[in-house]
């Protein structure tokens, strides 16, 4: 087992009950274009057109052959675009049960599939988009070969679902999905799970299981990659989430695209935090209707540390998100708040009384408790960064955009989620995720 000591389990109230309930009926789903790094769509549909589940909606111009398929049948209700006509979302008004069927195999045949058969079915169904590269976190080219594939079967994000609860319901599909992935490449398939977690596996020669323990970010793919198969400019691995592995297992046996998702609905602003069964791209405002405390709330698709605000054209469950988090907007001001002992506020430093209340769960809001200021290296980054890098120096390079030094310090190993804790504990109130993405884009273009 690999156990990390540095990190932080955010003591946030509103943790979900680890029992799966059926979610409300969803009448709108969407694909969010901005989730896919570097993607430029070539649209295959238009507004008002009827589509089947599994039908191609658009293709990536920059990555030919990579197609994005409809998560449900219905009519194209809207195609939202932002500045410079960047695709924000393709919205489908759900109607009927029409779907496209893909190749299917008897379970006994999965162990004999060729790499070409696996690749073809994943690409045609749109499940190829479940794979992401590291470095750069992009969808891999259709003819690319990874050094390894990392299956993330654990989650240490605040208010997250326990993957073992979800995998237990679909154990056979999960095992079949692993078997299919083992036929995609001869390289290692690394299945990463929490210490002692009951996660099934397959006996294929190239499948290895690893256990990780310790605080967040022990459950992030970036942590797993760093300790097992570090990447670099000339070494690429792929990552995939456990729910997508289940979907792959079902696709190859049934020939039908499975877009079911189990998400954690959590936060103190939720009346009954729990796990909900829904669909990929579900409209978040429909999922949370009647579920929230009547207040000024911020609804987030994903983790409170690294999720996206779910509203307007982005009011849909993200492709790579397994939770919906709800916290109160922190718009109010406190008179002499910095002088008070503040037992109800958490701090990683000793600036509040809440720091010393080790077993207390706190009500977090969106307030950042201060304005923008200079980056202050007081050791907080080192306390939450378990990777063998120098976080203060790396973060400084991200701020000034020094790509050469950032590469030397290990930025190619990282994704936005890997720096979310650094943003949380930063005295200077910097958001390091967007800074990292800007540097990675520059490196990819200019080297």
From Swiss-Prot:
Please provide, alphabetically and separated by semicolons, the GO molecular function terms listed in this UniProt record: oxidoreductase activity, acting on NAD(P)H, quinone or similar compound as acceptor
Tell me the InterPro entries matching this sequence. NqrA (IPR008703), NQRA_2nd (IPR056148), NqrA_C_domain (IPR022615), NQRA_N (IPR056147)
Q: Does the keyword DNA repair apply?
A: no
The record's top EC class is translocase
What is the purpose of this protein?
A: NQR complex catalyzes the reduction of ubiquinone-1 to ubiquinol by two successive reactions, coupled with the transport of Na(+) ions from the cytoplasm to the periplasm. NqrA to NqrE are probably involved in the second step, the conversion of ubisemiquinone to ubiquinol.
Q: Name the family.
A: Belongs to the NqrA family.
Instruction: Check the record and name the HAMAP family matching this protein.
Output: NqrA
Q: What is this protein called?
A: Na(+)-translocating NADH-quinone reductase subunit A
Q: What is the lineage of its organism?
A: Bacteria, Pseudomonadati, Pseudomonadota, Betaproteobacteria, Neisseriales
């Amino acid at each position: 087992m690999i156990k990390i000591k540095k990190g932080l389990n955010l003591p946030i109230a509103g943790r979900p009950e680890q029992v799966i309930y059926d979610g409300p009926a969803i009448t709108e789903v969407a694909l969010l274009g901005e989730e896919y790094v570097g993607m430029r769509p070539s649209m295959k549909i238009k507004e008002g057109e009827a589509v089947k589940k599994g039908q191609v909606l658009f293709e990536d111009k920059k990555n030919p052959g990579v197609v994005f398929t409809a998560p449900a049948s219905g009519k194209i209700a809207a195609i939202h675009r932002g500045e410079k006509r960047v695709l924000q979302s393709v919205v489908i008004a759900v109607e009927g049960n029409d779907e496209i069927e893909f190749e299917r195999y008897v379970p006994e045949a999965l162990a004999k599939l060729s790499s070409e058969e696996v690749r073809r079915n994943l690409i045609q169904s749109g499940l190829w988009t479940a794979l992401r590269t590291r470095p750069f976190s992009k969808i891999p080219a259709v003819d690319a070969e990874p050094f390894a594939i990392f299956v993330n079967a654990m989650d240490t994000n605040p208010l997250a679902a326990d993957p073992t609860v979800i995998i237990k319901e679909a154990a056979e599909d999960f095992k079949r999905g692993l078997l299919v992935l083992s036929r995609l490449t001869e390289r290692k398939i690394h299945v990463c799970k929490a210490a002692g977690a009951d996660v099934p596996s397959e006996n294929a020669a190239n499948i290895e299981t690893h256990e990780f323990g310790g605080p967040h970010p022990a459950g992030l793919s970036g942590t797993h990659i760093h300790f097992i198969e570090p990447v670099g400019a000339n070494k690429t691995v792929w990552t995939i989430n456990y729910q997508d592995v289940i979907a792959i297992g079902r696709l190859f046996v049934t020939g039908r695209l499975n877009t079911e998702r189990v998400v954690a609905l959590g936060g103190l602003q939720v009346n009954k935090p729990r796990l909900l069964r829904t669909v990929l791209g579900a409209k978040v405002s429909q999922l949370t209707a009647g579920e929230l405390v009547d207040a000024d709330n911020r609804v987030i698709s994903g983790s409170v540390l690294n999720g996206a605000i779910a509203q307007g054209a982005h009011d849909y469950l993200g492709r790579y998100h397994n939770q919906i988090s709800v916290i109160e907007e922190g718009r109010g001001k406190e008179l002499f708040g910095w002088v008070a002992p503040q037992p109800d506020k958490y701090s990683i430093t000793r600036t509040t009384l809440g720091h010393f209340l080790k077993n207390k769960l706190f009500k977090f809001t969106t307030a950042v408790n201060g304005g923008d200021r200079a980056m202050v290296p007081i050791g907080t980054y080192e306390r939450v960064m378990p990777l063998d890098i120098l976080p203060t120096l790396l973060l400084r390079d991200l701020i000034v955009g020094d790509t050469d030094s950032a590469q030397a310090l290990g930025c190619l190993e990282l994704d936005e989620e890997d720096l979310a804790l650094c943003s949380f504990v930063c005295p200077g109130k910097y958001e390091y995720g967007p800074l990292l993405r800007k540097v990675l884009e520059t490196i990819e273009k200019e080297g």
